[in-house]
Curated annotation (Swiss-Prot):
Species in which this protein is naturally found: Enterobacteria phage T4
Gene (name only): 36
BP GO annotations: adhesion receptor-mediated virion attachment to host cell; symbiont entry into host cell
Function of the molecule: Structural component of the distal-half of the long-tail fiber. The long-tail fiber of T4 is about 1600 Angstroms long with a kink in the middle that divides the fiber into proximal and distal halves. The thin tip of the distal half-fiber interacts with the bacterial lipopolysaccharide receptor and specifies the host range of the phage.
Keyword Transferase set for record: no
Main location: virion
UniProt name for this protein: Long-tail fiber protein gp36
Amino acid sequence: MADLKVGSTTGGSVIWHQGNFPLNPAGDDVLYKSFKIYSEYNKPQAADNDFVSKANGGTYASKVTFNAGIQVPYAPNIMSPCGIYGGNGDGATFDKANIDIVSWYGVGFKSSFGSTGRTVVINTRNGDINTKGVVSAAGQVRSGAAAPIAANDLTRKDYVDGAINTVTANANSRVLRSGDTMTGNLTAPNFFSQNPASQPSHVPRFDQIVIKDSVQDFGYY
């Protein structure tokens, strides 16, 4: 095969000449007809090919899938980056989840509406969750701790029930000051009554009885 060179002819006619040569210089660029030819010197830009630039960023107008996750480095330890990664299975337990949000220490939540401070913070090392707002739940809020420790700790139902049962047992073993009915014997060193007996079922006071073997003005009993 012959090389195509300047002045090459076919059938006695020049193949390329000034009138039909498709390459044209345009400043530092070379155009093929009206299209720019990219080279090592003139590399394509992100805007030329609808790319997102590594250096300048950009916007994806549609869904993007990252099979290996998204990694976000942070200042204190660049070797232990944070990020969002695919989980190890279909589940919602400590052993299995669909995605993992990974942080060296904490995950913070901020509002983009005029607020610079975090309103929710999650400690990924021990699972502590702190919030400046209200915690609302449509279902039950459950705790694995058996008993409260701090003054502001919430209490479990079994702990409250146990305390109520203790109070009830104590109440059932005592006589109320406002009045009560004994189901057993009542023993005391002395009973003091402010009012004299006035009903057949009342216990009489000392000043309402005649003492055995005592001498009375009206005779001997």
